[in-house]
Amino acid sequence: MNTSSVRPPTRDPAWLGRVFWSLAALVLLWPLLVATEFKPWVLLAPESLQVSGHFIGSFWPLAHGGEFLAMVARETWRTVAMATAGMTLALIVALPLTLMSTRVLSISALAGPMARGPFWLRQSVRWLLVVLRSIPELVWALVFVRVVGLGPTAGVLAIALTYGGMLGKVYGEILESGETDATQNLLRNGAGRLQAFFYGLLPASAAELTSYTVYRWECAIRSSVVLGFVGAGGLGQQMDNSMKMFNGGEVATMLLVFMALVALADRVSAWLRKGLG
């Protein structure tokens, strides 16, 4: 058989399937766009362009007074502190819940189905993690602002609860998806849950756990700025105050500082993940 005479197909053999799934996606997406009243062409209306131009024009000149920049530096540091303290509390919440919800660390499950008591305890902890991560940190911040008043304390507590639920869920999935033979051998030979965790699960999953934790810290910095708009302190609260006073120069300066802060957090996060990898 002369293979040199075989011509490649002139038409993609899978084109019909791609067209079908593209049309199906459009059919499913259209009702969602209608339900959300998505009308991007409104942005090009003369009134919208005029408002946008006036808003962007108010950003110049940038605010650069010494007293103002000192305040921005102070609130930026407070924002980083809020995110870091919130993540620390989130770890304190997540670690024990992870140990209780991870099936691999269940001694009663070694011989077969898990006993009734440990099973329901594990399920209760998993439901608690669902509740914690289902409520956005913005909602928690609104609640804590009413309880403890304005300031970073509300933001720290909000990040701690929401991120504690997220960390607990993902930590459990990472631990259960890794190599578990060493952990089960330790449990069968009389080791406790903590010993099995530190000497069995943790060494195999430490890099992935740390990488995800660093990523969540980066996300917490972004969230801490947003939480400031509901009174949780930090750079976001000062930005909200400047917007209410129609001081575009101050808003623009704080936006630039915020972008620089996020970029710095992203680089630190990437550096740490690279060092772990």
Short names for language-model regions:
Residues 1-88, 92-96, 100-120:
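N-terminal, non-cleaved signal-anchor transmembrane helix
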Residues 73-81, 122-132, 214, 218, ...:
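Alpha-helical membrane-interface segments at transmembrane helix boundaries
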Residues 83, 87-95, 99, 103, ...:
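Hydrophobic positions within alpha-helical transmembrane segments of bacterial inner-membrane proteins
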Residues 118-158:
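Generic hydrophobic transmembrane alpha-helix motif, especially the helices
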Residues 143-146, 150-201, 207-216, 267:
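Membrane-cytosol interface at the C-terminal ends of specific transmembrane alpha-helices
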Residues 146, 222-258, 277:
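Glycine-rich helix-loop "coupling/hinge" segments at transmembrane-helix boundaries
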Residues 211, 252-277:
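C-terminal transmembrane helix and the adjacent membrane-cytosol boundary/short C-terminal tail
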